[in-house]
Amino acid sequence: MQTTTRTLTQHKRIALVAHDSCKKNLLNWTQKHKEALKPHILYATGTTGHILERETGLSIQSLLSGPMGGDQQLGGLIAEKKIDMMIFFWXPMNAAPHEPDVKALMRIATVWNIPVAINQSSADFLLTSVLFEQDVEIDVPDYEGYLKERLA
């Protein structure tokens, strides 16, 4: 598939997601980085978003809870180029009932080439990268070209 470029602006649209056993870790991380996150547009799956907004005072656009379709909503936003990066603290030792949705979300994030952090260390690296505060060009699938090929 051909690619084209997309600009992630200096004001990022960031998805915050955590499995139940990781919500406290994501809350602690978010509190630690509250000032760095303030200028950005924050999205989260339902329960996580409500906890983060209540405990940090940050403005968070909460979607549905992950098992109720929130993971799929985030995937749709990524495919529509409305999410620039994702912080997803997940529990690798526990199977989630909505594991297929989680796998699909990670696949879409990979297809659309957005930066993804899956634990505190990788989230710290993303947030402290010099690229975080800049406009950044990334390669993404050329969907228009893909569609033309399929319809030819």
UniProtKB/Swiss-Prot annotation:
Family matches, as InterPro entries: Methylgl_synth, Methylglyoxal_synth_AS, MGS-like_dom, MGS-like_dom_sf
UniProt xrefs under PROSITE patterns: METHYLGLYOXAL_SYNTH, MGS
Keyword DNA damage among UniProt keywords: no
Domain of life (superkingdom): Bacteria
EC code: 4.2.3.3
Binding site for substrate: 19, 23, 45-48, 65-66, 98
Any one Pfam family match given in the protein's UniProt record, by short name: MGS
One example of a Gene Ontology biological process annotation: methylglyoxal biosynthetic process
Positions of transmembrane segments: none
Protein family membership: Belongs to the methylglyoxal synthase family.
Protein name (record): Methylglyoxal synthase
Organism annotation: Haemophilus influenzae (strain ATCC 51907 / DSM 11121 / KW20 / Rd)
